């Protein structure tokens, strides 16, 4: 059997357990002829055990015969940081206005969750990557240079 040819790769961010055919999912998949309800049911089934509403980046590979496969990534670092310090949004002026403080332990937890998607050599490098994301959101970082 010949290997199927990938026709398109679609990258979306979908809330866990809340995939439905409305925008942005419907139009993005529809223009490539993908079975939208098939994707929604499959995605919702795979994200059933996750926190409802958590944004999940997903990469959908569409093949020439209109079939598809998808790969779920880890939630965005900004979402995990906001969840850890219990705030709704980042600072509008991150260099001057701080919205909270995050500890090294919290950063290590986030780094362990994000590890499969990060290119860091070790957990310390991953912590520094997450710390940089936190600083750019206006979060004070404790325990990391």
Curated annotation (Swiss-Prot):
CDD domains assigned to the protein according to its UniProt record, in alphabetical order: Ribosomal_L11
Cellular compartments per GO CC: cytosolic large ribosomal subunit
Top-rank taxon: Bacteria
Transmembrane segments: none
UniProt xrefs under Pfam families: Ribosomal_L11 (PF00298), Ribosomal_L11_N (PF03946)
Entry keyword rRNA-binding: yes
Keywords on record: Methylation, Ribonucleoprotein, Ribosomal protein, RNA-binding, rRNA-binding
Keyword set includes Nuclease: no
Entry PTM: One or more lysine residues are methylated.
Biological process according to GO: translation
MF-aspect GO terms: large ribosomal subunit rRNA binding; structural constituent of ribosome
SMART domains (alphabetical): RL11
Alphabetized Gene3D superfamilies for the sequence: Ribosomal protein L11, C-terminal domain, Ribosomal protein L11/L12, N-terminal domain
HAMAP family: Ribosomal_uL11
Role played: Forms part of the ribosomal stalk which helps the ribosome interact with GTP-bound translation factors.
Family indicated by similarity: Belongs to the universal ribosomal protein uL11 family.
Subunit structure comment from the entry: Part of the ribosomal stalk of the 50S ribosomal subunit. Interacts with L10 and the large rRNA to form the base of the stalk. L10 forms an elongated spine to which L12 dimers bind in a sequential fashion forming a multimeric L10(L12)X complex.
Name by which UniProt lists this protein: Large ribosomal subunit protein uL11
Organism of derivation: Francisella philomiragia subsp. philomiragia (strain ATCC 25017 / CCUG 19701 / FSC 153 / O#319-036)
Top-level taxonomy: Bacteria, Pseudomonadati, Pseudomonadota, Gammaproteobacteria, Thiotrichales
Gene encoding the protein: rplK
